[in-house]
Amino acid sequence: MKLFVHLVLFISLFIPYFTKAALYVDIKKSSVGNIGLVVSKCTCKTALESELSENIAKVIGTNLSNCGLFNVKRSAEAESKSWKSDTVVTVSLSEISGSALELSFRLFDAFTKRELLTQSVVFPAKDWRKIGHLVSDVIHDRLIGEKGHFNTKITYIAEEKDSNYKSVRKIAVMNQDGSNIKYLTNGDRFVSTPRFSPNGKGIVYISYANGKSYIILKNLKDNTESIISAFEGVVSAPRFSPDGKSLLISHSLGGETNILSLDLSSKRTKKITKGSAISTSPSFSPDQKYMAFSSDISGSQQLYVIDFTNKSKKPKRISFGSGRYATPVWSPKGDLIAFTKIQSGKFYIGVMKPDGKEERLLSEGHKIESPAWLPNGREIIFTRTESPSNSKLYLVDLVKKNQKMVSTPTNASLPDWSYF
C-alpha cells in the first residue's frame, strides 16, 4: 500500500505543478526546432539497479524521441562538458528491497546551468515501464507546457492468416510504445471498430453473428465483456459521447443507413438522421454540442455537422473540395476535424476546421483511412493498406507532416487511442 501511495502522489501532485511551471514552446509553428535532450543514467550499485535504470532511461529516450519535439541523445556520463545547450535528464535507482526501488531523476539546463526539476518516487520493480512513461510525461509537461501521452494505450484490429489461410481478426490493445500487447478476443468471430471509453476502463466494439450486429463492451480491468445491445441489420462506427453516457452508431436496415444515439443506461435508441441518404461515421465535438458525420445527402459522400443546440438540427455541409469525404473525427481540443478524402483513385488523411475552412491534407497513399486523434490533438493515427495482405498503423503530426509506422506483430487496422 505504501508503494501505491507514493506512486499516486507522484502522478497527482507533481505533474500538474510542473505543467504550470513549463517553458512553453510554441508547437503550432512549423519553424520550431526540436529541443536537444540528453538522457543519462548514474552509476548503480547492484545488477538490478543497473538493469532497470537502463530500461527506464531507454523508455524515456524512446518516448521523447518519438513524439517529434526532441532530439534525444543517450549518454553513460552523469555530467559532460559536451552537452553545452542541451537539456539533461539523469536517472538513478536505489534498491530498497527485492521488489521495490526508489527512482530519482533530475532535469538540468546545461546552457543556463539551472536545475529545472528534481524528484524521486518509490515503485515496485515490476512497474519500471510505467515509471518510465510517467517520468516522460513530467518532462514533456515541464518543457512543452502540454500534458504528455506516454501512459496511454492503442487499440486496433489485429489480422493474420491461420493454418488454413483463413483471415482471423482479433481486438488488440497495447501501450502507446507498442509494448504489452494483449488480445481481447480469440478470433472465433468477426469483430470491428474498437473504441475506448472516455475513462479508459473499457473498449466497445462490433461483432456480427447469426444475422445480427452486437455492440459489446469489454472491461479492461477484469477482462469481462457484456452485450450492450443487439440489432437486426448492420451496425458500424460506434463512438462514445464525451460524457460516456451514450454511443453514436450507424445502423443499416431496410435500405436505409442512419445515425442513432444509444443510451447506455436505458439501452434506448434515438434516430438522429432520417431518410434514404447513407449517413455514417458520427463523431461528437468535445463539448457534445455538435456531431460531425459523412453522408451522401447531396449526391456524393461529404462531411456534415449537426448543431444540437439548434432546434431544427438540420445538417450543415462543411466539405466542398473535389472528391469524396469520409470518417470525420473531432479533435480532443475541438479545433479541427480529421477525415479521409478519396479523389482520383488516391486516398488522403486531412484536417479542416469545424466550419469546413482551412482544409489541409497531411498524408497520401494507395489506401489510407480510419483516422483517430492522439489525446494531445497534434497527431493522428491511421491505417495504411499497401495490398490486401499488408495493412499497418501510421502516425502523422499536424505541424511537420512527419510520418512513422507503429510497429505491430500482425496486420493492423481501425486504430483508436485512449484518452489521458
Swiss-Prot record:
A Gene Ontology biological process term: protein import
Q: Does the keyword Cell cycle apply?
A: yes
**Where does it reside?**
Periplasm
Q: Which GO terms describe its cellular component?
A: periplasmic space
Q: Does the keyword Transferase apply?
A: no
Signal sequence segment: 1-21
Q: Which UniProt keywords apply?
A: Cell cycle, Cell division, Periplasm, Signal
Name of protein: Tol-Pal system protein TolB
